[in-house]
């Protein structure tokens, strides 16, 4: 399974999509080319005819930090490519965790609306959904291993 396939299937499974239209377009184009044997996403998007996508690609690919020569000489460096099998699932969970956290914030804001307090059915429904998402958030936090969910 390629990274593109994994990301597309993982997002479809949870009925998620990127909010940013550029990210959606890039994923859509990557999906269209994912079975092309000579398709290399990095090259494709860097040379994209749309300069905005090309610039975004540069920003996404650019390595922000470099390991000092002292450390790189004394130890074997494990590259991102070698760690894809562990990084991609973890990054997808991070992405979903951020979505769930944002949704919970919006729900809390909605629950503060006095008009909602007047409608018991809507309020109960929103509270039930809030509790479900809180449970999902807690499970995701445990899988990520380094998150503390405050109640």
Please provide the spans of the model-predicted regions:
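Helicase-primase coupling helices
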Residues: 1-151
């Amino acid at each position: 399974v390629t990274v593109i396939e994994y990301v597309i299937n993982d997002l479809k499974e949870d009925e998620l999509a990127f909010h940013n239209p550029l990210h959606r377009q890039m994923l859509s184009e990557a999906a269209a080319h994912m079975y092309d044997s000579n398709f290399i996403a990095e090259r494709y998007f860097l040379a994209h005819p749309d300069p905005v996508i090309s610039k975004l690609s540069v920003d996404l690919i650019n390595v922000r930090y470099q390991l000092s020569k002292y450390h790189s000489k004394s130890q074997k460096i494990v590259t991102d490519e070698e760690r894809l099998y562990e990084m991609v699932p973890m990054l997808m969970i991070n992405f979903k965790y951020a979505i769930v956290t944002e949704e919970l914030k919006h729900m809390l804001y909605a629950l503060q609306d006095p008009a909602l307090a007047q409608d018991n059915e809507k309020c109960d429904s929103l509270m039930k959904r809030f509790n479900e998402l809180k449970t999902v958030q807690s499970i995701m936090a445990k899988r990520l291993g380094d998150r503390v969910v405050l109640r």
